[in-house]
Every structure is written in C-alpha cells, then in structure tokens.
Amino acid sequence: MPQGAPGFATRAVKIRPAVVSRIKPVDMNIVFQRLSLATDERFDLIIGTNIFLYYGGFEQSLARVNVAAMLKPGGFFLSNDKLPDTVPSGLEQVMVSEIPRTGARVITDYIYCYRRTQ
C-alpha cells in the first residue's frame, strides 16, 4: 500500500531483532487443535487477531479453552475479538483497550487482554 493512501492508516510496532529471533509462529486450527505442552513449555503470551470472527460462539468457546491450555498460569492472550465465556476456560478478561483510527471515518479497534487464572 502506498504511504499516505487515502482511507488507510499505517501502524507499526518496533521489535528488537533479538526478540524476533525467539518468536516461533505456529499454524494450527485453534478450535480443534492444541499443542500438548508440559507446564514449563507453555506460552507466556499468545496473540490471535482477526481469526475468531470466522467462528460462532460455540467454536469461540472451544478456542478459548484451547488457548488457556497452552498458556502458563498467569500468561496472557491478546485478541481483537471479545470471546464468550459460556464454558469455563481458566481465562479471565483483565483489560480492554480502545484504539481509535482516524481517516475518512473514525474506526475503533479493540484489544482484549485475557489472563490465565489456573
């Protein structure tokens, strides 16, 4: 996208190369799959953006349980979707951030922060 294209906003986060080299992306179906991890192998942070809108409430609840199972106790999950809490998952919503974007019209992004409690 060209710099300054009308109707688009560019946002970026600078991450140190040493941190980037330690990131291990995992491609999986979050509704039906989870990694079997020992407690010391679980993640401190999982980020899932723009994926839950493709699933209904039941599937989102299953995904929430799977995410919790892959987090260390006290670990965090960030998503731009508010997930239903219809099934006990061990995740509690601890924060939501509103990020307004301006342009031709104002759009607000939401970042939901969940923490594993168990």
Q: Which residue stretches match the model-derived regions?
A:
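A short SAM/SAH-binding and catalytic strip from SAM-dependent methyltransferases
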Residues: 43-58
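Conserved phosphate-coordination/catalytic loops
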Residues: 17, 58-61, 105
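Residues at alpha-helix caps and immediate loop-helix transition turns in enzyme cores, especially N-
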Residues: 39, 59-63, 90
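Conserved beta-strand signature within the Rossmann-like core of class I S-adenosyl-L-methionine
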Residues: 45-47, 71-83
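A short glycine-rich, Lys/Arg-flanked "PGG" loop and its adjoining helix->strand segment in the class I
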Residues: 60-73
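Short "lid" loop at the C-terminus of a central beta-strand within the Rossmann-like core
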Residues: 31-32, 82-86
